């Protein structure tokens, strides 16, 4: 009653109902669906009123109204200058009849609120796009280039609206609009001249404007103190330019939705590397700090070998060693050692010799202290790249899952989408037939994005049309482990990671090959690993030949008919240069109501903040299990709050249940790395892999990151660390237990807005 008063508006009453209902979620997680229904009622009222239809509608009425709502939405969106007028030329009556209004009931509160806050098309903050119209608009946009537009749009709609698969955020934002920028990731190489440097920064601004996430390779730019021949002066190095990149990302907001997001990469032999690793520190000269930009190390195998062998490492300026940037594997090692020899003879006089282990320690201490630079591995990305015949992978992207060639002439682009694994389990195992069906449609949708995409920069269009890379990923991995009653920290989970990714990989590659039969192979196909019958599983051999057996520990088992698929590709070709990448999926996992990507559950109960305020999120499978055991009550809720969403310290919960519902910090990093290693053998790009460590130490970090390298991982993402002090609790004077952290973040270094695992707003790779 306290929310009701004389003069209260209907909108305030509706808002109060939602807020009241969502407070009940912590006691009974199914209230998330009840809250979503109340919110749905409000959304319908807002949208239908704007479209001039009626002020509210029940569920059965809405199922009747959806065809008309679609028609009016298209008319209004085109009139407002937002939607592509070509949508109106499709058979709207047929599409309207295909809408499944009952699927409105599948949303959790968080999923629907996320769509309302961030995705639905609006006019002066009034949303007039209804949930199923949203999915149909995206599907129509993706079908514009098809011959059978309506048939394909309905096929795409059924995949999205059933939550079997979800396109990435830029695709959901912009498909079917006047500016159809549907791609998630852009990768660029910055040349070593002033014109090229500022051209790259301008490209960043233009690409970021339309919600793309950026990865920049800065290795070619000469180091601090090296000579500039044109002026006979000394270079200020990479860092001052990175400060400009940082401030540009802040200044350019993504279509009014959020500030731009960028990650800068530097190779470990660059003379500026010691300053580069400190860019995110909160102390020191602020003119040489980038507080809003992500950074990543691009580490060659030779450096890791030198660390292991306790040897020295030489830093060069790229203006003296220009070819190192384009070399990898044994060719890099040979040339690097030749340059080292030239320092002995005096041919190269600008260099710095350091202890490899000392630099490694500094890299690890900065990753712990600031969360950056991330650790990513150059040689494995190149040696296992299908496209090594036409270029070099010089960096990854904003979320470290994309590994595509870049050069001064080519900006790499990748379009993402993720299969919801929880919808592909039947009778306790993977539903192979459904996985094949889902992936066939998903690959087609991703390939369509390339042709209908809006390209803000010509070099991006050139490379995307030439190579046609896409990135199919997965989400809901930990939810599936719950369904299978399998703890993440187990050999069974590692084996499931292997078999599930093998199946996704097999059908993704097959679908791209089948699409090539229909549409033709991508233009740079000849000479690729694909054309030689070398699939991702086969490229491990190339890595082993370069690195040596003693520095590689990778499982190479397989279960599917890969020989048959090799023959199919030789006959049909393949449509896309790269087919798979596992993105973080933070936002789209919220929409579909599953665990993010390959992430372990962060906490079993926590308070989430978004544009609509704070609300509790609980682990629904865990609550169901505890209910079955008669253990779910108010005391359990308070215990979970007290222990920050962890079940480990609650004595009345059986041990096997504690193992099953262990949170991220309770799972040894070994298990995450082993599962990632098994997946990586099947993936032609990479995976966004966050690592979690409880009570970190230099030794633990050293073991963890060296293990990641030895297991053949291409990239790692954030390091999440939690000190011993964060688990200490005290009872407040009132006797109430401490509330769980409102952000569900560990006590670690402040992180940027980009791609935080508990930030539902990251638009780049999700």
Feature annotation, model-predicted:
Residues 88-114, 402-405, 446-451, 555-559, ...:
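Catalytic alpha/beta core of large soluble enzyme barrels
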Residues 31-75, 108-113, 299-303, 320, ...:
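Terminal amphipathic helices with adjacent charged low-complexity linkers/tails
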Residues 729-766:
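Acidic, low-complexity intrinsically disordered tails
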Residues 438-461, 487-585, 655-658, 687-688, ...:
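Internal maturation/activation junctions in enzymes
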Residues 121-122, 126, 134-181, 187-230, ...:
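Function-dense linear segments that define catalytic or interfacial modules
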Residues 127-195, 333-365, 370-375, 500-567:
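Gly/Pro-rich turn-and-neighbor structural signature
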Residues 278-279, 287, 291-363, 367-370:
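Polar, glycine-rich mid-to-C-terminal structural blocks
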Residues 1-128:
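Often metal-dependent polyanion-binding catalytic scaffolds in large enzymes
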